[in-house]
Amino acid sequence: MTLDPEGGFEQLMSMARGFQAAKMLTVAVDLAVFDFLDQPRSAVEAAAWLKADARAAGIFLNGLAALGLLVKQVDYFHNSEIASRYLVQSKDDYRGAILKHLEHTWERGWNDLQHTILAGSPQGVEPETWVDTRPRRDEEGVKAFIWGMDAVARDLAPQVALKLPLSGVRRLLDLGGGPATYAIAFAQANPDLRATVFDLPGPSEIARENIAKHGLSSRIDILAGNFLQDDIGSSYEKYDFIWISHILHSNDQRQCRLIIRKAAAALVPGGGLAIQDFFLNPDGYTPLGAAMFGVHMLACTPRGRAYTYGEVAEWLQEEGLAAPSLIPTSPEASVLLAAKK
């Protein structure tokens, strides 16, 4: 939310209370409340199923109903339409993984924001080894993050596929592709396209599962590695198009330039490079979503932040790409699209 200059103190109270609804939602997902309440149940039944205190369960369910996550009819509760669609684990459109990821970032990032602001980076994080050590120390958190990225991109990726110049592209690299959601959408929209998804070994296993689920294992390959350190596949084949989605914001400027340099070197002449991110305007604080995401990266990564589209455009041109165009892909994100000269 943004503040109304004409508004009163209640705006600040509303902002400060924002954590309450967020915590109720993530706790309900963690407890699988929505799985149980996809049919009407009483608070007593829910408490017994949850092995919870009956009084506490009743108060909690009424709070979820007040938020619109549950519907209450007399003494029975059941999922609202939106909760039933997105928050029941057995359903195809389940999106709870991203909510679990956001809860992890609260516990291990935002909760210690004051220290991070004073010290410059989160506690217990070694910038040079953060990417390699995180999967080993936090396997469940990484799994929630990668499937969460699928939850966020699932609706958007088919729309993005229609906005990119992929007609005629035969070899595409999805660099840092996570669950392969975008590679899947690009392959579905372009029958002649073959894709490679490059990411760390843990995310690569999730990508393999997701690709197989969509019947695209014969057209989408997996290449596991660390794109800051390893060859991204260009030593044996150049790519017609490289897609980099929501990768730069986790890295510092030196790392971002390295990523762009490696991508540019891996392209054929005339090949396209598309970078999607939460780009800031030149003023550095708009749009709101990008500015807030910049703080999110401050809280959760050793060196990440949001970048202006001008900064990234300059790096692209320094690596021999033409001046990029800016294509909005969602209310908060855009794509910088450039061709290799």
Task: Name each model feature, range by range.
Residues 1-72, 166, 171-341:
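Alpha-helical subdomain
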Residues 2, 9-36, 41, 49, ...:
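Conserved Class I S-adenosyl-L-methionine-dependent methyltransferase catalytic core
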